[in-house]
Amino acid sequence: MANVTAALVKELRERTAAGMMDCKKALEEAAGDIELAIENMRKSGQAKAAKKAGRIAAEGVIFARTEGNVAVMIELNSETDFVAKDASFMAMGQKIADIAATQKIADVDALKAADFGNGESVELTITNLIAKIGENMNLRRVMLVEGDNLGTYVHGSRIGVITKLTGGTAELAKDLAMHVAANSPQFVKPEDVSAEVVAKEREIQIDIAINSGKPKDIAEKMVEGRMKKFTGEVSLTGQPFVKDPSMTVAELLKKEGADVVSFTRFEVGEGIEKQETDFAAEVAAQIAAAQKA
């Protein structure tokens, strides 16, 4: 067996960020050849990362980038908020957003296949960081919007918005992106609210009125007024502007000679069922697994 020195173990730890015992074992198996040890660890690290893929990555960060008339937003997930704040994770996420913007990539699979700039794909770069940190990660989605007046806003790394305007200023586009982040409208304008959503809300409001003791015909008349208020509340242009509630967004747009074409809002983990762990059961399972080993 080759003589594995403390200096070799230290160098391997620095180059791989793996644990001391893992590094010592890898060097012993590679007969002291550090390059072979790294190659073997990368192979086993990727296999180890693949095993983690079943774990739920419901934390993460929203990254945004504007490049000329292109705005891009991505969601990169991790299992814990701690890893989402890691410098390597943050740098990788911003680089992926930059790649999507400069290469105009609007598809997740295409973005995963893109060159990260280090001779490896985006997907492999993510996999390598999974192996290094020991926690599952996932490039969940990407949105690309093209237009002459685009606004992006990211709040606390967890909520991101892209707005697309005709007319107006870049500042207005960003202000409206901030508004969407804060107020979470579902539609651009009241007339965009789908018939299905309106019908469902009308039914709910009629039931509320009837249950309060109103006759059905009176209840139906009351609800018509409420429905107009409802469609305004769930649409961007019908809401009071977040920076000046004395005017609606529609009034602001008229004043600025602008219109909103679209908006996209991402929030970290939305739609992902987060796994709730019974800590006592998890510890018991780990002890049982250790006893079997």
From Swiss-Prot:
A GO molecular function held by the record: translation elongation factor activity
Stretches the record annotates as Involved in Mg(2+) ion dislocation from EF-Tu: 80-83
UniProt keywords, alphabetically: Cytoplasm, Elongation factor, Protein biosynthesis
Location of the protein in the cell: Cytoplasm
Gene3D superfamilies: 1.10.286.20, DNA helicase RuvA subunit, C-terminal domain, Elongation factor Ts, dimerisation domain
Entry GO CC: cytoplasm
PROSITE patterns (UniProt xref): EF_TS_2 (PS01127)
Origin: domain of life: Bacteria
Name of a matching Pfam family: EF_TS
InterPro entries: EF-Ts_dimer_sf (IPR036402), Transl_elong_EFTs/EF1B (IPR001816), Transl_elong_EFTs/EF1B_dimer (IPR014039), Transl_elong_Ts_CS (IPR018101), UBA-like_sf (IPR009060)
Record has Protein biosynthesis as a keyword: yes
Family membership: Belongs to the EF-Ts family.
Function: Associates with the EF-Tu.GDP complex and induces the exchange of GDP to GTP. It remains bound to the aminoacyl-tRNA.EF-Tu.GTP complex up to the GTP hydrolysis stage on the ribosome.
Protein name, as recorded: Elongation factor Ts
Species name: Aeromonas salmonicida (strain A449)
Phylogenetic placement of the source organism: Bacteria, Pseudomonadati, Pseudomonadota, Gammaproteobacteria, Aeromonadales
